[in-house]
Swiss-Prot record, chain A:
Lineage: Eukaryota, Viridiplantae, Chlorophyta, core chlorophytes, Chlorophyceae
Gene transcribed to yield this protein: YPTC5
Identification of the protein by name: GTP-binding protein YPTC5
Keyword NAD: no
Lipidated residue numbers (S-geranylgeranyl cysteine): C205, C206
NCBIfam families tied to this protein: small_GTP (TIGR00231)
Binding locations of GTP: 15-22, 63-67, 125-128
């Protein structure tokens, strides 16, 4: 057990400004919530060491600026991501409509080798707001979108009330680890970027 | 608009006065968005506006005018595509590459050579990195020095080259109310005409360079891009912001000298002139200032500048 290597999982949180990306990250990692987060400019990350299914994992969770204008710079941090968490506010229909853009942009910028099987996750946040009376996006609608994008797992969360936050991130970890295993099975000699690059180069030459 | 997501810095944004302070912020930022639809509202503008509330604790009009003046300097930072931010990040890399090759090389090796970690510092003019009480000392010192350097060189300060865009976009707006019209006119007066073909005095980039060099040892001890990002997001507050600007000015002049030597003493498109540096040293008469702008792009440059300099004078 103790000789097992600790895996590093890079998680990117994306979504419109004000949907609660920073709050979700802080609730998960530091178990605290405050309404007073400053708007994120650029990017920041927190790490958390966990153990899932007997595997030791260091989660590196990246929180990026949500305003569209900053998107092109935030993408500098997408590289090497193991999974991507798309967040919207269930009380804000536009933030849900924008999920398509965030997903597409991530795929373009991060360039995962197998985009169709890349582990995404969708979180509908702020379910606590006004006791649910201001909701604009139903669970059914959100789940339908997730199903149409290749069965993306969906969780309804409240960073404020700490509802489903731990469960969602545990699920993210499992999916990322499973994806890692499948990648290993798929191309056993090409698990790091350099090997892949060399192979590609070789293929180009011959 | 998320005016409420402003830090609790300053008396007017704390405790019982916070709701009123946030209302004022919202009014001023809304008025600005109406005046300048190309920029509109962007996150970070609250950070720039908040200190002005304290300078003009009761007068929204004056605070608005001052904010327009401030935006005049940094407006390009907020325009779509972030082309000007990329240019500034590229210049920052070029400046550090020239003035502290070891530090620059280290940052490149660990994957932080794009300097995106300094994005917040540049965008918000170090507003979040310095103590609240120091914000205005820093900004005013920086603006004064920038004006002096610009006057000495005959080149425009960082603000120039944006008037046309404001004038164009404002024509497409619905008719303004009398008060808005007055504000708009005052804003227009703050906008200098664009100077085609000139280069700018980007002292703010050198202030950020000075701040980074002040933390050289810590940056050299960062072993990864991630560590640099975390360090930058919890940047140690500079203790003396005037000294920081002094240092920035010295870096600016030194960078200019090195660029001039590298380019064999001639730089096309730059103006001639002499100046006296902050520590009273008389500089050589032959285009000492002009050379300092070698990393800056022409004002009419197109977006899409690469992160490693990008113009004809860029580091190879």
């Amino acid at each position: 057990m103790s000789t097992k290597k600790r895996r590093l999982l890079k998680v990117i949180i994306l979504g419109d400004s004000g949907v609660g990306k920073t709050s979700l990250m802080n609730q998960y990692v530091q178990k605290k919530f405050t309404k007073e987060y400053k708007a994120t400019i650029g990017a920041d990350f927190l790490t958390k060491e966990i153990e899932v299914d007997d595997k030791k994992v260091t989660m590196q969770i990246w929180d990026t600026a949500g305003q569209e204008r900053f998107q092109s710079l935030g993408s500098a941090f997408y590289r090497g991501a193991d999974c991507c968490v798309l967040v919207f506010d269930v009380n804000n229909a536009k933030s849900f409509d924008d999920l398509d853009n965030w997903r597409d942009e991530f795929i373009i910028q991060a360039g995962p080798p197998d985009p169709d099987n890349f582990p995404f996750m969708v979180l509908g946040n702020k379910i606590d707001e006004n006791g649910g009376s201001s909701r604009q996006v139903s669970e059914k609608k959100a789940k339908a979108w997730c199903a149409s994008k290749g069965s993306i797992p969906y969780f309804e969360t409240s960073a404020k009330e700490d509802i489903n936050v731990e469960a969602a991130f545990t699920c993210i970890t499992r999916n990322a680890l499973r994806n890692e295993k499948e990648e290993e099975l798929f191309m056993p000699d090409a698990v790091d970027m350099n090997t892949t690059a060399t192979q590609r180069k070789r293929a180009g030459c011959c | 608009m998320d005016a409420e997501r402003i830090s609790h810095d300053g008396q007017l944004l704390q405790g019982a006065s916070r709701p009123a302070g946030i209302d004022r912020l919202r009014r001023i930022l809304t008025a600005y968005a109406l005046t300048d639809s190309e920029v509109g509202y962007c996150q970070g503008m609250t950070d720039l506006c908040a200190p002005l509330l304290e300078v003009y604790p009761r007068d929204d009009q004056q605070a608005f005018d001052a904010f327009c003046g401030l935006m005049g300097r940094v407006r390009a930072n907020f325009l779509g595509g972030m082309a000007d931010m990329r240019r500034q990040l590229g210049l920052l890399g070029e400046v550090l590459g020239r003035l502290d090759a070891r530090l620059h090389r280290h940052l490149v090796v660990i994957g932080a050579g794009s300097y995106v970690f300094a994005f917040q510092m540049l965008l918000l003019q170090l507003r979040r990195e310095v103590a609240w009480a120091d914000v205005f000392v820093l900004w005013e010192t920086m603006w004064a020095r920038e004006a002096r350097l610009a006057a000495a060189s005959g080149l425009p300060p960082a603000a120039a080259g944006r008037g046309a865009a404001v004038a164009e976009t404002s024509q497409a707006q619905p008719p303004l109310q009398p008060q808005q019209q007055q504000q708009h006119q005052q804003y227009q007066e703050l906008v200098p005409p664009p100077l085609q073909g000139a280069v700018r005095v980007d002292l703010r980039v050198f202030v950020v360079a000075a701040a980074l060099l002040g933390q050289r040892a810590a940056l050299l001890s960062c072993a990864s891009m991630e560590e640099v990002v975390q360090f930058a997001n919890h940047f140690p507050q500079p203790t003396n912001v005037v000294a920081l600007v002094d240092q920035a000015e010295r870096l600016f002049l030194k960078f200019g000298r090195l660029q001039r030597q590298r380019n064999g003493g001639s730089l096309s498109g730059c103006l001639r002139g002499g100046c006296t540096s902050s520590n009273g040293v008389e500089l050589a008469a032959e285009e000492p200032m002009a050379a300092a702008f070698a990393g800056a792009l022409p004002a009419q440059a197109q977006p899409g500048v690469t992160a490693d300099g990008g113009d004809e004078h860029g580091a190879s």
